[in-house]
Amino acid sequence: MLLRRRTRIPRVWPVLALILALAVTSTSWQPAHASPAAGSGQAVPPPPKPEPIKVRQLPLPPVTPSIEAGSCTTENNPRGTGCIGQSPGLFSGNFLPDSRNIVATVLFTGAPAAPHPSSIYTGQQLILVRADGTTFPNGDAWKCVTCGIPPGNAPGPADAMDYPQAFGDGKRVLAGTNIIDCGPYKLADRACTPQRVRIYPIRWNTTADGSGPGGSIRELRLHPDDTHLGFSSMTVTGGRLDQFSYMGRLQFNPSPTTGTPLVPRYDLVKVSRLFDPNATQPVDVDPSDPGKLRFDPFVPSVGELRGFSADGREVTYVGYPAESSNIDVFAADLTTGKVRRLTADPEYVDPVDLSPDGKWTVVMDTRGTDRLSFLSAMRGVPGITDLLSASAISAARNNGKRRFFQPYLIDAYGDRGSYAGQRLNAAGDGSPGSINDPLWNGRADPKWSPDGTHIAYWQSLAVAPDCGGQNPLPCPVSTAPGGRTERLMIADLTSRPPQTREPVVPVSDTVPWGVPYEPGSAIPARTHLTQGTYTLDGKKSGSAEVTVTENSTRTAISTVAVTYQDYSDDGRYVINGTETMTLQNDTPFHNKIDWFSDLVRTDIGTGRVHATKRTSPDGFHLDITVGTNKFQATGTLTTTVDGHVYNQPANGT
């Protein structure tokens, strides 16, 4: 069955000998004290010792060098079970409940024309990949679940099948806006054949009368109760790109009478928006004194939903920066709204998965690369200018399709002191194709096995135009089978015994700190500070004077200017100086930022200058488009911490 790719906003062989590497610890150098994860309610223990990790590359279908019909021959694949291209369109997902199989989607290509039996291996398809070195009965280390589905078994729209996630019953997979179902059969069983597989679309009703195709949903994440679904939906507020996250119940509708498509489908019902415009926001006016601001990143502020804890109690998300220019992931209790900060490294993170026992976090993070440290390495600066810069900083994490992510394992207490987690794929010599080759970059999402002994992740290689040509980074030559530019990896946590997953806690259809969504209701405008001058008091000492200027239509903030005077939240360091930022958007996706900074962070006890954050005299001017993610700037912004200088990346890199 051919599944066409739907346009998305990016944020986007034969069995080979397993590649093994013993991973040693890799602790990112932290330029300053990193706060532990909040909300533990317990004394924070010392960081864990490095543990032994072996990383293997898992097999995928063989590669055909051409995408022409018929180019996948028995010479490429003697079993006639299909080929993928050098750019295989890989999306790695989670494990089936047996911890032996990983769900993934790939783009098959080069199939012969029908009625050849191998003609079914074409287009985007769901596959299972053996994670334990064994094979399926036909001798392949993978099984295509959807290849050859009769058209009547998938009557809905052919939407992209990204971010595949297996249900706990082992019989169903969420892939894109579809649920792939093998009825009473487990997907890995021989009895689960394409003739028994059904694909059902998911629809979110957004009209009062139930008409139309429903709302646009993205970044879907399955709740571990197999009943609820988290998702995000983009919008525009005040001419700027915005996004809200939601949680709803999946309800099978075998015979819909309203809305499209009019085919058996899953409807999202009892939906809650994880944003309440009437609740306290991370940066808000003090209700007892309208001239003062309150800054609290530990109120629920879901920027983009990223998943759930294994027991289902918490939702994970990219949150409002707890420190200026430092984008982290958080977890909020779905009932109480209590928030934990999962990461605190100055670099960028968003892909995240919590371990089955709830004691560990795995992330894809730019830590160790210094990609964004020129913005964020000075610690303890409250996220005030982030009212304008969050989207642009998020876009700067990539260079086009080139990512800078690597997988890190962090304990539940988070980054602290010099501890910044353990890199899963640290071992190796960094040579082309090695486990720790820096040009193989992580993608979303890393996933734990249900028994807690493995972590699956996938990577892509930098390719033109994000290298080569005018780009100063030469394009690497792939050493992967067939020269493909994506690979599926598994990290074996060899010293860990199999775990028992935490029981899933029943959750309500209503999130108390969210707002029930009424189909047809207007999308709320995200509130913003009104024009004026405010004072933000440091938690320990000092203050910051914050001047907010709105745009000409008073629909959004255009400029934020901050003057710090002996400002301190931790009682160890004070911040002095000024920072001013202006944002212009000629389209919702295009950000032009004018940034002037002259900040100094000083040790209270000794008076020693610990860090500075300064722009060149003419300022730092960033021009970047969300989705394109090409870094272009004039002027400089430089952060220095204890003599360590962090410079911005070169334009186009």
Predicted regions and their residues:
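Secretory targeting and sorting signals
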Residues: 2-34
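Sequence signature of WD/YWTD-type beta-propeller architectures
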Residues: 38-653
